């Protein structure tokens, strides 16, 4: 016990010295990961022996120490092979060789000089994600010994680096658009240049490619006009219209007259509830409502997201479901919103984007 405590104390003192030194030499970064590796091994052994506290220090769980130790070994070996190359004389800081940087895309590579790239999905400024284009990427060769230094580049398809003659994309805009968007459209902004989604550029438009060094080929500044010939014109990326004209009646399905690509194919509106709009109750004290139906977690997130639109509805219920109804499952919930008028409800539906996984039914409710 005393031997473990003493060795752990010496190891952590050495780590503090390295942090205070804040060196930019590769050998110091290798020493740092050796100390992390030893610290994890000592903590693992102490926990394995049944100790939960060592030197007034709570010991992490066995799985935590083991996982962190494996990562320390991985980084130590990578830096030791880098030390045998010409890149060992370059300045290397703790930040350059930290685990978070190592795990950032592209994973398993050393990276420096990052530049932020903004990607806007579906033309909505509030649906923007940020990615990093690296000025320097160091990746290991196939033999596991040598290293190659490249810079990352960006085009309409994603962010990549060159491995010999092949593009290795570590950010695929199409996959990201399917994850964060609904219409498969995206716009990339970096500095003064804009790169549009391939689906919105004509076949005569030349491919855009920008390197992290600041050089660009066929780039289009944000305030410039696309090049055209006499017969073909480049089509700019136009976001889907925010306003959809919906027509509700007792004998006609709701439809969109301004969305040619069928963006609402997955959204169902019940006609049975729409018929209630024309029904008069004896009390006359009724309010327009919308039932939003979907998976409970999705509905919870949706209810939180619409808080910024409080001026467009009166009240929102918690998630509920029908009881004693055949076919009803607790995996499908309902959130009900009330409105002061039909006009307010229509304004809400025009303004707020409803996720395609949520269906809705319109109606009225007596208060």
From Swiss-Prot:
- Cross-link Glycyl lysine isopeptide (Lys-Gly) (interchain with G-Cter in SUMO) per UniProt, renumbered positions: 293
Query: What is the role of the protein in this entry?
Result: Plays a role in the initiation of viral DNA replication. A dimer of E2 interacts with a dimer of E1 in order to improve specificity of E1 DNA binding activity. Once the complex recognizes and binds DNA at specific sites, the E2 dimer is removed from DNA. E2 also regulates viral transcription through binding to the E2RE response element (5'-ACCNNNNNNGGT-3') present in multiple copies in the regulatory regions of the viral genome. Activates or represses transcription depending on E2RE's position with regards to proximal promoter elements including the TATA-box.
Ranges of Polar residues compositional bias?
A: 207-233, 249-259, 275-286
Instruction: Return the InterPro entries for the record.
Output: E2/EBNA1_C_sf, Nucleotide-bd_a/b_plait_sf, Papillomavirus_E2_C, PPV_E2_N, Reg_prot_E2, Regulatory_protein_E2_N, Regulatory_protein_E2_N_1, Regulatory_protein_E2_N_2
List keywords of the entry alphabetically: Activator, DNA replication, DNA-binding, Early protein, Host nucleus, Isopeptide bond, Phosphoprotein, Repressor, Transcription, Transcription regulation, Ubl conjugation
Region: DNA-binding domain, residue numbers: 286-367
Family, per entry: Belongs to the papillomaviridae E2 protein family.
Q: Which GO terms describe its molecular function?
A: DNA binding; DNA-binding transcription factor activity; nucleotide binding
The name of this protein is: Regulatory protein E2
Which Pfam families does the record associate with it? PPV_E2_C, PPV_E2_N
């Amino acid at each position: 016990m005393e031997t473990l405590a003493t060795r752990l104390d010496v190891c952590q003192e050495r780590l503090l010295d390295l942090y205070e030194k804040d060196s930019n030499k590769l050998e110091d970064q290798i020493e740092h990961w050796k100390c992390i590796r030893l610290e994890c091994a000592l903590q693992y052994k102490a926990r394995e022996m049944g100790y939960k506290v060592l030197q007034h220090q709570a010991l992490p769980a066995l799985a935590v120490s083991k996982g962190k130790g494996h990562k320390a070994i991985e980084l130590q070996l990578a830096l030791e092979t880098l030390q045998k190359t010409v890149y060992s004389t370059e300045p290397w800081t703790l930040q350059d060789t930290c685990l978070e940087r190592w795990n950032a895309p592209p994973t398993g590579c050393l990276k420096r000089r990052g530049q932020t790239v903004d990607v806007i999905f579906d033309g909505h400024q509030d649906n923007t994600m940020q990615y990093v284009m690296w000025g320097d990427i160091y990746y290991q060769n196939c033999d596991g010994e040598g290293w190659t230094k490249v810079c990352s580049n960006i085009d309409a398809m994603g962010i990549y680096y060159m491995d010999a003659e092949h593009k290795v994309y570590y950010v695929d805009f199409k996959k990201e658009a399917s994850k964060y968007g609904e219409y498969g459209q995206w716009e990339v902004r970096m500095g003064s240049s804009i790169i549009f989604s391939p689906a919105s550029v004509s076949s005569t438009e030349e491919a855009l490619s920008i390197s992290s060094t600041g050089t660009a080929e066929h780039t289009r500044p944000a305030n410039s006009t696309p090049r055209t010939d006499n017969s073909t014109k480049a089509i700019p990326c136009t976001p889907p219209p925010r306003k959809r004209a919906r027509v509700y009646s007792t004998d006609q399905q709701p439809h969109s007259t301004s969305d040619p690509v069928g963006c609402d194919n997955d959204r169902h509106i019940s006609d049975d509830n729409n018929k209630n709009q024309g029904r008069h109750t004896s009390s006359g004290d009724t309010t327009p409502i919308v039932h939003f139906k979907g998976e409970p977690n999705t509905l919870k997130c949706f209810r939180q997201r619409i808080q910024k639109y409080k001026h467009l509805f009166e009240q929102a219920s918690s998630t509920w479901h029908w009881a004693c109804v055949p076919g009803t499952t607790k995996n499908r919930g309902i959130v009900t919103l009330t409105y002061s008028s039909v006009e307010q409800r229509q304004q809400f539906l025009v303004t707020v984007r409803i996720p395609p996984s949520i269906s809705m039914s319109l109606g009225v409710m007596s208060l």
